[in-house]
Amino acid sequence: MLFDAFTNGFMNDIFEFGDRSKFNRSAWLSCWGPALELRETEDTIEVDVEVPGIDKQNLKVDLHGSKLTISGERKKPEEEKAGPLIRWSERCVGAFSRTITLPQPVDEKLIHASLNNGILSIVMKKKNPEFTTRIVEIQ
């Protein structure tokens, strides 16, 4: 049956262990987007994103409400384009995008981003919560 042929091939690929596995977990996951770390201090929310080999001109940071999006592109090295045939590669090239929901509102005017040694660091000042008092009439 067609389904059996598909599942047998698929299962063989999944359980093919070793260096040539098509489902090498660490290589597969790394292509989804760069790893990041989110920290929260009393006054700030800080995000570090691992983007080695990507120039700041190829990175973009957007804030839409409580959603922070980091996007960019890792270009293929020039020597690979005209070089020998690559038989195996776990390097990820191309566009990526990561969106996270911030745990608290931030002041969109007080955001700082810097790139140093392949780490994109984003520091955002938390908004001061505005507390109001209101007496609610019971109906």
Curated annotation (Swiss-Prot):
It comes from the Eukaryota. GO terms for biological process: chaperone-mediated protein folding. SUPFAM superfamilies: HSP20-like chaperones. The keyword Mitochondrion applies. Its main location: mitochondrion. InterPro entries: A-crystallin/Hsp20_dom, HSP20-like_chaperone, Small_HSP. Disulfide bonds: none annotated. PROSITE patterns: SHSP. It is found in: Mitochondrion. Residues 27-139 form the sHSP domain. It holds the Pfam family HSP20. Keywords: Mitochondrion, Stress response. One of its GO terms (molecular function) is protein folding chaperone. The keyword Mitochondrion applies. One of its GO terms (cellular component) is mitochondrion. Belongs to the small heat shock protein (HSP20) family. This is Heat shock protein homolog C338.06c.
